Amino acid sequence: YFTVLDNRDYRWANELTIKMVFLTLLYSETLYIMDSEPALQRKYADLVMQVKPQKRQFTLQDYLMEFKYVSLAEVKRSGEQVRKMGREELAALPAVATLLDDAHAKLVGYRDTLIATYGDILRLRCFSVVAVGYERLVWRAV
């Protein structure tokens, strides 16, 4: 999907760009209530995908995602180098690891708030997602 974005698009790249890509690809008005930046005790999760009440009879999962973006310059790698690296190798890069840890900490708080609000009806899966430029995604389940 990122291949449609050009080098000039890097100028405005940030986590909002990544969230919009996910919203575009995952949006399903028939299955999910998509909630971008929902207020959770005065903090804001990036994306919550909550199964619609009338679709709860299916084994669909609810999702909570926190997005981060790190530029190629910040990881001191070229696009070609990043494309050749394994996911675990990318996750170990200091800039990526820091963002994964930050997203993880936020997700734990958001998850607790969502569970306290909705209770046992949620089948919540939580993911921190870091985009390394427009080249690769690194994710971690919480």
Locate predicted features.
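Structural signature of nuclease core domains in nucleic-acid processing machines
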Residues: 1-142
